[in-house]
Regions:
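Phosphate/diphosphate ligand-binding glycine-rich loop within oxidoreductases
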Residues: 2-116
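Glycine-rich adenosine-cofactor-binding loop
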Residues: 8, 103-106, 113-114, 119-141
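Short coil/turn segments at beta-strand junctions that form active-site/ligand-binding loops
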Residues: 53-56, 120-121, 143
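NAD(P)-binding Rossmann-fold cofactor-contacting core
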Residues: 141-148
């Protein structure tokens, strides 16, 4: 079985498990499973990876997008620049696991503005990992932006 999942503190609001279960079924991937992993503290991350040998990838949500970074073996250059990770890929070699963090919010935000005029000013609401990705893109485009 190829396991994937979402980690966060409280996941009752999440539709990720339903979404990915339907996606795996639609793509005829009975070998894939998506689970929710509520962690009371990010220090539980390494034990989660260690105790689930079929776990190959995780989405990261509130409040762990920033605090997971020091626990990873490697962080993608863009995710390091943003200071937030929302996706972790887990490479397995026997019992050993190598974790690599990425930030897919950056590319998602860039693509959402493709074909649109880039603003000269922007107000970003929120202070979490997704807001950090938005600010990163706007600053790359020399947009005068404020964070609230």
């Amino acid at each position: 079985m190829r396991d994937y999942g979402l980690i966060g503190k409280r996941l009752g609001h999440s539709f990720s498990q339903q979404y990915f279960t339907q996606k795996f079924a639609a793509e005829n991937r009975p070998d894939c499973r998506y689970s929710l992993y509520e962690l009371s503290d990010i220090s539980e991350f390494e034990e989660l990876v260690r105790s689930h040998p079929d776990l190959l990838g995780l989405n990261i949500t509130i409040p762990y997008k920033q605090t997971v970074i020091p626990l990873l073996d490697e962080v993608d250059v863009e995710a390091a620049r943003v200071g937030a990770v929302n996706t972790v890929r887990i490479f397995r070699d026997g019992n050993a696991a190598h974790t690599v963090g990425f930030n897919t919010d950056v590319e998602g935000f860039r693509l959402s503005l493709a074909g649109h005029q880039v603003p000269t000013r922007a107000l970003v609401l929120g202070t979490g990992g997704a807001a950090a990705a938005v600010m990163h893109v706007l600053r790359d485009w020399d947009v005068d932006c404020r964070l609230v």
